[in-house]
């Protein structure tokens, strides 16, 4: 609710989506968007959106999906030890094996993609596992995927994170194993 208020205050068109969840919000935004490319990113000030030129350049070169890669550019205190050295690397390894892709940071919160190509994938995960679903479906479709380095800064928001490490990690792993979303 606060993110939507702040976005409106800065001139963004905010799309209201009835179903709760990270994936639901993004799918609703993708459907409502009007541009050729979509750059999505966490709104907690942990990413520098002035750096999106690299994403757009790769998309213009014909890549369907462009992933950010936080590793090598993580500010001190921006990611917990367990996420940096256990959760993200292990889930990304499982995703690389399952989807035969080189993406090393499956959970980077900033990425770009071709809107029409994304719509054609039939994305349906309502929760955090959407982050894995979109990579898996782009990889399986044969679309070209690029990865570019990004910096991760400390979270700048005042509120608490919506991330629930164990349940969300399980949902990602479950999607990788079964290739289907958990339905509520």
Q: Model-flagged regions — what are they?
A:
Residues 1-16:
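Acidic donor-binding segment of Leloir-type glycosyltransferases
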Residues 2-6, 41-58:
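Acidic donor-binding/catalytic loop of UDP-sugar-dependent glycosyltransferases
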Residues 3, 29, 44, 114, ...:
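Residue-level signature of catalytic and energy-coupling elements of molecular machines
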Residues 7, 59, 138-140:
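Hydrophobic residues within well-ordered alpha-helices
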Residues 17, 41-43, 148-150:
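Cofactor-binding loops of NAD(P)H-dependent oxidoreductases
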Residues 17-32, 37, 49-128, 154-177:
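Acceptor/aglycone-binding surface of glycosyltransferases and processive sugar-polymer synthases
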Residues 101-102, 123-126, 135-153:
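Catalytic donor-sugar/metal-binding loop of nucleotide-sugar-dependent glycosyltransferases
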Residues 180-184:
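A charged, well-structured terminal subsegment
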């Amino acid at each position: 609710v606060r993110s939507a208020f702040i976005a409106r205050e800065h001139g963004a068109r905010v799309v209201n989506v009835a179903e709760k969840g990270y994936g639901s919000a993004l799918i609703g935004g993708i459907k409502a968007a009007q541009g050729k490319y979509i750059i999505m990113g966490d709104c907690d000030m942990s990413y520098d959106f002035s750096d999106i030129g690299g994403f757009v350049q790769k998309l213009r070169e014909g890549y369907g999906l462009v992933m950010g890669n936080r590793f090598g550019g993580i500010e001190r205190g921006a990611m917990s030890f367990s996420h940096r050295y256990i959760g993200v690397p292990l889930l990304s390894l499982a995703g690389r094996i399952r989807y035969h892709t080189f993406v090393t940071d499956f959970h980077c919160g900033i990425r770009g993609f071709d809107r029409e190509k994304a719509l054609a994938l039939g994305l349906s995960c309502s929760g955090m596992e959407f982050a894995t679903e979109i990579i898996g479906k782009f990889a399986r479709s044969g679309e070209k995927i690029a990865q570019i380095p990004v910096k991760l800064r400390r979270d700048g928001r005042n509120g608490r994170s919506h991330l629930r490490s164990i349940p969300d990690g399980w949902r990602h792993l479950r999607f990788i194993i079964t290739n289907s979303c958990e339905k509520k």
